[in-house]
Design a protein with these regions (language model features):
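PLP-dependent aminotransferase-like
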Residues: 72-113
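Conserved PLP-binding active-site segment in aminotransferase class I/II-type PLP enzymes
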Residues: 1-73, 77-78, 99
Length: 113
C-alpha cells in the first residue's frame, strides 16, 4: 500500500508569488541591523494603521502572538470558553489555551464554509 504524503502547508509556493518584493525588503531590514522595533517596524505600523483606518497598530512576530494579544484585549482568560472551528491551524487552539481559556470546537456548515 502506497501512503500519500500531503504537506501541512506549502510556504515555498506562496513565497514564489511574492519573492521579488520579499527579498528586496528583507535585505533592507538586514542592512539596517534592526530586526526588532526600529524604523522599518515603525514605518510598517504607521502605514498599516493608515491603510486600515485606525489610530494605532502593533506588529507582532507571528499569528499566534496576534491571536493571544487579541484574546487578551477582549478580556478572555481563565474560565472562559472560546468557540472555534477545528478546521484551522493548530495555533488557534494553542492561543486560546495560552490565555487560560478552553477551546470549544464546532463544525462548519458545508454550504456556508
Amino acid at each position: 500500500m502506497k501512503i500519500l504524503q500531503i504537506p501541512l502547508i506549502n510556504l515555498k509556493k506562496q513565497y514564489e508569488t511574492i519573492k521579488e518584493d520579499v527579498d528586496k525588503n528583507v535585505l533592507r531590514v538586514f542592512s539596517s541591523a534592526q530586526y526588532i522595533m526600529g524604523e522599518n517596524v515603525k514605518q510598517f505600523e504607521k502605514e498599516f494603521g493608515e491603510y486600515i483606518g485606525v489610530k494605532h497598530s502593533i506588529s507582532v512576530g507571528n499569528g499566534t502572538d496576534a491571536l493571544i494579544i487579541a484574546l487578551k484585549a477582549l478580556g478572555i482568560g481563565e474560565g472562559d470558553e472560546v468557540i472555534t472551528t477545528p478546521f484551522t491551524f493548530f495555533s488557534t487552539a494553542e492561543s486560546i489555551s495560552a490565555v487560560g481559556a478552553v477551546p470549544v470546537f464546532v463544525d462548519v456548515r458545508r454550504d456556508t464554509f
